[in-house]
A protein has these predicted regions:
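Beta-rich carbohydrate-recognition and catalytic domains
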Residues: 1-144, 148-179
Length: 179
């Protein structure tokens, strides 16, 4: 049996974001180009590979571009993918990070959205920026959104890795629920 290991040319694979539909597995991953020595997770975008059998992989390229140096999504980090039955569009919610966006001396994280009719060409929704209000949860840890449909409430839920306000750097980590 052969060994399967995917590595893009001139980059590293960050987090893997899986999605499955109609017999095809979609493996979004954080494409880390490591442009500068000893600099990790800078200029990160979402790239896509597809497979039906986990032996033959089809690289599709960049699916979500990052923003510019003045945008919240200078780096596009981990998130999740859903397909909305109402509009037929794919919706991706992902962590947006720019080390230059700071509050009280700490970098903040936010959530952005990308949509598309197919998974290969997703466009960031420029006016969607979801941030913590800084009352219950800290603004610094607001990341890794996971979105799913809740049948009982008939609405989408979003889970986020977060931190309860004023618990210190080593305490207070939690999962935030947004409806």
């Amino acid at each position: 049996m052969g060994r399967l290991f995917y590595k893009p040319e001139n980059a590293w694979v960050g987090d893997l974001i899986p999605y499955y539909e109609n017999g095809t597995y979609y493996g979004f991953y954080l494409h880390d180009p490591r442009i500068r020595d000893k600099e990790y997770a800078e200029e990160t975008t979402w790239h896509l590979i597809e497979t039906k059998d986990f032996v033959n992989l089809d690289y599709k390229g960049e699916s979500i571009a990052r923003g510019g140096i003045h945008d919240a999504n200078k780096n596009a980090y981990t998130g999740s993918v859903i397909k909305c039955e109402k509009d037929g569009l794919y919706h991706v919610f992902y962590t947006a990070y720019n080390e230059d966006f700071k509050l009280r001396g700490k970098t903040i994280q936010s959530v952005m959205q990308a949509t598309g009719k197919n998974l290969e060409n997703l466009e960031t929704v420029k006016d969607f920026l979801f941030v913590s209000d800084g009352k219950q949860y800290e603004e610094f840890d607001w990341r890794d959104p996971f979105v799913f449909w809740n049948d009982e409430d008939q609405c989408y839920y979003m889970l986020l890795a977060s931190r309860v306000m004023n618990r210190g750097d080593l305490r207070g980590g939690c999962i935030a629920l947004c409806k």
